[in-house]
Amino acid sequence: MVAFTVDQMRSLMDKVTNVRNMSVIAHVDHGKSTLTDSLVQKAGIISAAKAGEARFMDTRKDEQERGITIKSTAISLYSDLPEEDVKEIPQKSDGNSFLINLIDSPGHVDFSSEVTAALRVTDGALVVVDTVEGVCVQTETVLRQALGERIKPVVCINKVDRALLELQVSKEDLYQSFSRTVESVNVIISTYSDEVLGDVQVYPSKGTVAFGSGLHGWAFTIRQFATRYAKKFGVDKQKMMERLWGDSFFNPKTKKWTNKETDTDGKPLERAFNMFVLDPIFRLFAAIMNFKKDEIPTLLEKLEINLKSDEKDLEGKALLKVVMRKFLPAADALLEMIVMHLPSPVTAQNYRAEQLYEGPADDANCIAIKKCDPTADLMLYVSKMVPTSDKGRFYAFGRVFAGTVKSGQKIRIQGPNYVPGKKDDLFLKAVQRVVLMMGSRVEPIDDCPAGNIVGLVGIDQFLLKTGTLTTSETAYNMKVMKFSVSPVVQVAVDVKNANDLPKLVEGLKRLSKSDPCVLTQMSESGEHIVAGTGELHLEICLQDLENEHAGIPLKISPPVVAYRETVEAESSQVALSKSPNKHNRIYLKAEPMDEEVSLAIEQGKINPRDDFKARARVMADEYGWDVTDARKIWCFGPDGNGPNLVVDQTKAVQYLNEIKDSVVSAFQWATKEGPILGETMRSVRVNILDVTLHADAIHRGAGQIMPTMRRATYAGFLLAEPKIQEPVFLVEIQCPEQAVGGIYSVLNKKRGQVVSEEQRPGTPLFTVKAYLPVNESFGFTGELRQATGGQAFPQMVFDHWATLNSDPLDPTSKAGEIVTAARKRHGMKEEVPGWQEYYDKL
């Protein structure tokens, strides 16, 4: 066992070329935590007997009970590679010991914000795919996120034991199934890849794909088999690797290689992969599982596997585990693949810097990040907060991109809204301690150089969720993470005992710190609202809130859905509003924006912080906007980055710039709470046509302009055929054929519409994809399991906003009922006000 000390690891941290930061990502239940176990065991942290069952990285009690990962956990491992392997690494390295910082992330779709946080601080990803189920919706989502952050993937095809023992497939079928999976991963990679990253497709013949079983603790790459055979037959290893995959066949009679499936007499030949790689594995499985006592010793001798005396008495699965572990230890295959094919921080930061850093690409900090320079000014990105054993305190978990972080060092803590040169969202504080994250434990260290992943103590009070730490006064922030899911399910939380209210408020603060994608807010009527990405996510958050963060009994309302307000047409007449003192007037019209523009804003392709000329160019070329309009976008709303715009179409108005700030803040206010049901607006574009202002500055202050602009926005909105939008989940359901009927009946009952249904070749499984309104999704999983006898497993992820056709202003329609219910809940008058209420006559 390699029991290593913290000092050894600290000295490795300085050799940045020998560090690998990687995360493990996959679809739910494809076996990430189980696979991670065999790596952890190799590093001597859990015993070999437990690996595969311990799920060491699932540190929380509810994770062990539910058998799912909820939070991403980090651990540092130490590994030695043999000399001849080190020579073949395609990048610089120093010595043959390597430090691997590994983050195990959740696969469940509700927690994909945890995955985003894990990806930000790593450079490579191990994508785990189930042999039987193949590439699923969540595999695609996480892979897309990874490529968006310019992270290089390697693949491990897991659960091969299932294919051998449960499905009893033939060798050729198994090869075809592997090659289909690799093919579909490569399709995703080529769809979302980016030029800077280059070609990152995975090829078994190059050693970037491993095959194995996390539960049994064995895995192999083609490179390992090629090494064995190269020694045995005295041939070149590289040539052997290429021949062990794809259409190459070996004719044992003539001892010749060919790429035809038959020999000269027309007899079928066996594929090299099947013959040299799968055959020994299949033989072992057959001999052991059919209890052929006499064959086993000869096989083991051929494969050079020595059993201890007590292991010789085992039989069946127990013996299989021991033998396969000795024959093809999982950790060796995976560590070799990680070290050889994933980039070191030096290599990766070179091409990731411009995407991580908000400032210009030629400033000193960006260059330091590119070089991963430990002597430069500190640049550290905190991607999430990890709760400590000490109640209410958090470790800041992040990665040093440049410089060195030391305990006791004074640093600048820059929150997400910090702008260089200003004092907003900035704190100057000292780091108390620097620690190494080791699963559920932490180890203190003195300092940590660039390129490593680290935990910090003592700065949690100054950061909400994420932020940039630096010692340079001119540093811009690191770019904010984009989450692929949005919080669309909310509940109102209240205390059972009124004395506990302060505890609840404190608990909500802590909750929003500990989860990157939960929203907590207080509504106008005084309710405390918690919003999550789905039912499961919300359930875990509330359980944490009740037991950990607040520690008091709570009353929880039934879940409700967040809607959006939008318009269908241009305002039927110009909306006019006068200021309270009757001296200023604003004339405007509202109109809908294209869905693709709204999506581009939500995904950050059109960014309020970009240069307005460059942004106008993009909007004109890609979305067909008029260039002068695109240049005159005053602001995005709500929160300064939402999918609603104010466009200035006025001509020659005096004093216009003086009221710009008031108009902008009024628009943020109006779009945050629309006139119909007090929800956020979406895809609304407001064109200001004309403004009449009083000549005296004192009569056109914010107090005069803000209410006017808000009323005008509401009037224009209500004149433009208002509609409401509801969030829609994309549901992917895997099930056997006989259960498909049950799925359709449940979906029809819940206003779902089926998008596609296909059978996975080589398995009895069907995949059904459907759209399901979030409003109908509560209890969907339970009903589905009932209708299909527990054979169907749904995965739901937020997909898009769908406009409801009925009129929200008519209280008898479907939309009208939603509006009435929401207005009651928000404590507003039940009647929706008409546009006349906000419109002023000349």
UniProtKB/Swiss-Prot annotation:
InterPro entries: EFG_II, EFG_III/V, EFG_V-like, EFTu-like_2, G_TR_CS, P-loop_NTPase, Ribosomal_Su5_D2-typ_SF, Ribsml_uS5_D2-typ_fold_subgr. SMART domains: EFG_C, EFG_IV. The keyword Zinc does not apply. It is found in: Cytoplasm. It catalyses: GTP + H2O = GDP + phosphate + H(+). It comes from the Eukaryota. Belongs to the TRAFAC class translation factor GTPase superfamily. Classic translation factor GTPase family. EF-G/EF-2 subfamily. NCBIfam families: small_GTP. This is Elongation factor 2. The lineage of its organism: Eukaryota, Fungi, Dikarya, Ascomycota, Saccharomycotina. The gene is EFT1.
